[in-house]
């Protein structure tokens, strides 16, 4: 939309808008942020506010809408949630003193990945901006949470010039809110599948020059004031460095100020953590319930009793990034064990942590210049708790609880306590949120401010005192101090005494009965009185900035303490959860044995109502019990058993105690899951396609130290196709690289139980069921051996299927079991008649089949069939044989 005739204000607006074309421009006008033209048309329906216009009487009036500046955050949040970006344009001078149009500038751009306001953020989740690129044969991923200062990067080998699946999974694992991609990716068919994988993330395309390696390195070195990136372990990093440089460029463009709170760039490797891809995270319900997408019903809902926001974020990271280092895991378990064994100290620490605010986000806001007086007060309260926290921690010995990452803990504690004292001496407890209203600085801190405050509070009495002093000094009984809007404050003396005024009095006005004068001293007093509020606000802001700068200088120490307290918080939370839920410390082994005695599903056991949770034992190893085929009816609990094994392994490697009587566990490097049945119809993917994609991912990437959880693969296609696929996958995982992989395979294909006799490391188990009077009771107990019954009709009855349907199902089942080819109808006479017809049809069919073979030499085929021992064949072997015979028949029929 264009404007035919531009006013000076609209010229300014359009000039600024031109620099930020992909944003909604919040243009400050007095007490409102206004939006014009296309921005107004986009924003009004999202914000649910009235759309109006400027110059309504003219042709083509300009669409506009506005929101109060005090409520801007609420409206900005709505725009961000709808996928829009917001450029905040402020008035840079007082409109009262401006000559011409008020000077305005964009002070920051808010995007989904660039949010500092805690009201717009999930307190216990990071808010990552990520960047992905390909450079010199490598694929790199970097991410930054500007609200906490976290900045990380990694890279891996590109596959045929493309981003590998492992890096796509990593971008999903960090749950980025915004992803930067090179502009050249947009519209390029090569990257269409990659972009499709990130449909839940807002993608921002930026110029390819932002990803250039050389400029990225220079940008990072300048940012961290270093000569090289060697100290960050990034000197040999190509794509990872390019991605990090692109993020830094984007941050500088949107925030328009330095990010001093981003103190380091951390390089990490994907293979140093237990990998759980995004699908497995969903299937295991680590962070969200798969049905409701809520936190309730997930693993984190059970484990998260952290006190602080930063502790909550770290716990989430521990769940998504379990360790594979035995030493690292044991260090966490040692800390949890000690905290669990000392409930008095643990409870005292947790009580003190209730007064600790989000130090990471407070530090970031202060460093970025977005903090208000109440943020400083929150920091003060938090820092005052350090001595009490350290006093309790000194009674414990676990290395994780001693803050060894802080070089001199006592010195840092003392420095930060002194910083808290400074805040206490300067910032009022009842200070307002706004920085321009005064009322921020404590009385007694600044003599100059105290004088201004005295004048502001008692201006009239101060003027009266000045008048009394002048009257006494001059001896003029008629002397008075008065005020009007023309002259301000002035001295008035009667006509008779006007000849006796001191020489330094300056005549200002002559009246019939009096003369009016001013003095330099009076004008100075007047200036102080009339400008007291403005001077007060200005001085208080300057003093506030000085205190803020003192805090910024201590930002590294604040962040170290924040990270340490977050770790303490997580340890205390895991200890509390372990005690409340009767968890036990897992033992770790190097023997590739996964042995769980009386294991429980941590979430399901909390949700069971009206019945006792039945624990189950599982043992997996690489010698005899590597692949377990688990059969049993629906609703019996197969899926729960499968998931609990994966969750117990994950919990142990994140450093948590586990829900089991005993757990002796090997280190798992990756967990794969194929569980659940959520169709992705919106992408045109059926249940079967989703299953096959997940299965393909597993068979292509599983290794010796992985754990594979398979639940009902092969559905959504014909029975024999599904069974064949399930069988082949089970065999493949058993034979993988000649070593196999630990696998739990729940299935309704009872034919798979034959694998136990064919493969040395396959074992059969089933979920026990008790039958009585044509009903079943689920015992929920995993027992050795297979089963050949699915109890589908009984489960249907439990689900509330009408009796008429159940009765009919039994008839059909009996008929099928007796004669699979028989067609069952409503009428028994029809059944007999149909059966007779079927026999006749089969006889005719056999004759036709004999005629088909007539005239051709099929002796070879008949000989193969005669010599084949069907009882020793697997379904895969049988299908292969049938395929070969069909090819031979076709070739002979064409002769």
Swiss-Prot record:
* Record field: compositional bias (Polar residues): 837-849
| Entry's Gene Ontology molecular function annotations | ATP binding; ATP-dependent DNA damage sensor activity; damaged DNA binding; mismatched DNA binding
Keywords (A to Z) from UniProt:
ATP-binding, DNA damage, DNA repair, DNA-binding, Nucleotide-binding
Q: Record-annotated residues binding ATP?
A: 632-639
Extract the ranges annotated as region (Disordered).
824-849
Q: Which GO terms describe its biological process?
A: mismatch repair
Which Gene3D superfamilies has this protein been placed in? 1.10.1420.10, DNA repair protein MutS, domain I (3.40.1170.10), MutS, connector domain (3.30.420.110), P-loop containing nucleotide triphosphate hydrolases (3.40.50.300)
Superkingdom of the source species? Bacteria
**Entry's CDD domains?**
ABC_MutS1 (cd03284)
Concerning InterPro entries, the annotation shows: DNA_mismatch_repair_MutS (IPR005748), DNA_mismatch_repair_MutS-lik_N (IPR007695), DNA_mismatch_repair_MutS/MSH (IPR017261), DNA_mismatch_repair_MutS_C (IPR000432), DNA_mismatch_repair_MutS_clamp (IPR007861), DNA_mismatch_repair_MutS_core (IPR007696), DNA_mismatch_repair_MutS_N (IPR016151), DNA_mismatch_repair_MutS_sf (IPR036187)
An annotated GO cellular component: cytosol
Instruction: Respond yes or no to whether keyword Secreted is given for this record.
Output: no
Pfam families named in the record:
MutS_I, MutS_II, MutS_III, MutS_IV, MutS_V
Q: Which family does it belong to?
A: Belongs to the DNA mismatch repair MutS family.
Tell me, in a sentence or two, what this protein's role is: This protein is involved in the repair of mismatches in DNA. It is possible that it carries out the mismatch recognition step. This protein has a weak ATPase activity.
Instruction: Tell me which HAMAP family the record gives.
Output: MutS (MF_00096)
Q: What is this protein called?
A: DNA mismatch repair protein MutS
């Amino acid at each position: 939309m264009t404007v035919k005739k531009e006013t000076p204000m609209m010229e300014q607006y359009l000039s600024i808008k031109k620099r930020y074309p992909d944003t909604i421009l919040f243009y400050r006008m007095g007490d409102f942020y206004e939006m014009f033209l296309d921005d107004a048309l986009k924003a009004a329906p999202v914000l649910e506010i009235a759309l109006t216009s400027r110059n309504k009487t003219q042709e083509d009036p300009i669409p506009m809408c506005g929101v109060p500046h005090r409520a801007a955050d609420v409206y900005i949040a709505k725009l961000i949630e709808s996928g829009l970006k917001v450029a905040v344009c402020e008035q840079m001078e007082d409109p009262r003193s401006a000559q011409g149009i008020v000077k305005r500038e964009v002070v920051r751009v808010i995007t989904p990945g660039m949010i500092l306001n805690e009201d717009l953020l999930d307190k216990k989740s990071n808010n990552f901006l990520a960047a992905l690129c390909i450079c010199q044969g490598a694929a790199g991923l970097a991410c930054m949470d500007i609200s906490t200062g976290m900045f990380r990067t990694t890279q891996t080998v590109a596959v045929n010039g493309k981003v590998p699946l492992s890096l796509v999974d990593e971008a999903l694992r960090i749950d980025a809110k915004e992803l930067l991609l090179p502009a050249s990716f947009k519209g390029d068919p090569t990257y269409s599948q990659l972009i499709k994988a990130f449909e839940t993330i807002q993608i921002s395309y930026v110029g390819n020059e932002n990803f250039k390696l050389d400029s990225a390195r220079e940008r990072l070195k300048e940012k961290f004031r270093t000569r090289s990136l060697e100290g960050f372990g990034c000197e040999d990093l190509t794509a990872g460095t390019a991605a990090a440089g692109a993020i830094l460029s984007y941050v500088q463009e949107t925030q328009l100020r330095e990010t001093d709170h981003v103190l380091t760039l951390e390089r990490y490797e994907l293979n140093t953590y237990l990998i759980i891809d995004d699908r497995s995270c969903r299937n295991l319900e680590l962070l969200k319930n798969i049905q409701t997408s809520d936190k309730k019903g997930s693993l984190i809902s059970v484990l998260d009793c952290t006190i602080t926001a930063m502790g909550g974020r770290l716990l989430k990271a521990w769940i998504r990034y379990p360790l594979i280092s035995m030493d690292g895991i044991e260090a966490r378990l040692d800390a949890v064990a000690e905290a669990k064994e000392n409930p008095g100290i643990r409870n005292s620490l947790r009580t003190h942590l209730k007064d600790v605010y989000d130090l990471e986000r407070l530090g970031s806001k202060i460093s970025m210049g977005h903090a208000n007086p109440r943020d400083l007060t929150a920091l003060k309260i938090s820092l005052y708790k350090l001595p009490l926290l350290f006093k309790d921690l000194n009674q414990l010995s676990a290395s994780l609880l001693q803050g060894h990452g802080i070089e001199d803990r006592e010195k840092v504690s003392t420095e930060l306590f002194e910083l808290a004292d400074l805040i206490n001496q300067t910032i009022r407890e009842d200070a307002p949120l706004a920085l321009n209203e005064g009322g921020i600085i404590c009385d007694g801190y600044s003599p100059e401010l105290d004088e201004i405050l005295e004048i502001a509070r008692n201006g009239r009495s101060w003027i009266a005192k000045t008048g009394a002093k002048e009257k006494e000094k001059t001896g003029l009984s008629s002397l008075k101090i008065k005020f009007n809007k023309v002259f301000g404050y002035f001295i008035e003396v009667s006509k008779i005494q006007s000849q006796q005024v001191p020489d330094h009095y300056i005549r200002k006005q002559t009246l019939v009965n009096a003369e009016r004068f001013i003095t330099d001293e009076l004008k100075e007093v007047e200036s102080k009185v009339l400008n007291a509020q403005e001077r007060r606000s200005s001085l208080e802001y300057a003093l506030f900035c000085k205190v803020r700068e003192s805090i910024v200088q201590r930002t590294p120490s604040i962040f170290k303490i924040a990270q340490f307290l977050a770790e303490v918080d997580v340890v205390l939370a895991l200890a509390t959860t372990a005690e409340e839920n009767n968890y036990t410390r897992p033992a770790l082994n190097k023997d590739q044995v996964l042995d769980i005695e009386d294991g429980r599903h941590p979430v399901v056991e909390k949700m069971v109502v009206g019945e006792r949770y039945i624990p189950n034992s599982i043992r997996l190893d690489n010698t005899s019990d590597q692949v377990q085929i688990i059969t049993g009816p629906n609703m019996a609990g197969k899926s729960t058993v499968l998931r609990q094994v994966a969750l117990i392994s994950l919990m142990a490697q994140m450093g948590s105690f586990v829900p089991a009587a005993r757990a002796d566990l090997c280190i798992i490097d990756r967990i794969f899951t194929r569980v659940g049945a959520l169709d992705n119809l919106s992408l045109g993917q059926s249940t079967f396609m989703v299953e096959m994609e997940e299965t393909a991912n597993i068979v292509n990437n599983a290794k010796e130290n992985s754990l594979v959880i398979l639940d009902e693969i092969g559905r959504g296609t014909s029975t024999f196709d599904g069974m064949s696929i399930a069988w082949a996958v089970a065999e493949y995982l058993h034979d993988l690289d000649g070593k196999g992989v630990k696998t739990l395979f729940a299935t309704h294909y009872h034919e798979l139980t034959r694998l136990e006799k064919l493969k040395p490391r396959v074992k059969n188990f089933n979920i026990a069921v008790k039958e009585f009077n044509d009903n079943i009771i689920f015992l929920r107990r995993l027992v050795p051996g297979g089963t050949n019954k699915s109890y589908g009709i009984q489960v249907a009855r439990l689900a509330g299927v009408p009796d008429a349907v159940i009765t009919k199902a039994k008839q059909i089942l009996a008929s099928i079991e007796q004669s699979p080819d028989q067609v069952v109808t409503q009428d028994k006479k029809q059944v007999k008649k149909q059966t007779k017809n079927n026999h006749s049809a089969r006889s005719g069919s056999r004759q036709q089949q004999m005629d088909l073979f007539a005239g051709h030499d099929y002796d070879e085929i008949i000989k193969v069939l005669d010599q084949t021992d069907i009882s020793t064949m697997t379904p895969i072997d049988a299908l292969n044989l049938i395929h070969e015979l069909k090819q031979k028949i076709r070739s002979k029929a064409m002769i």
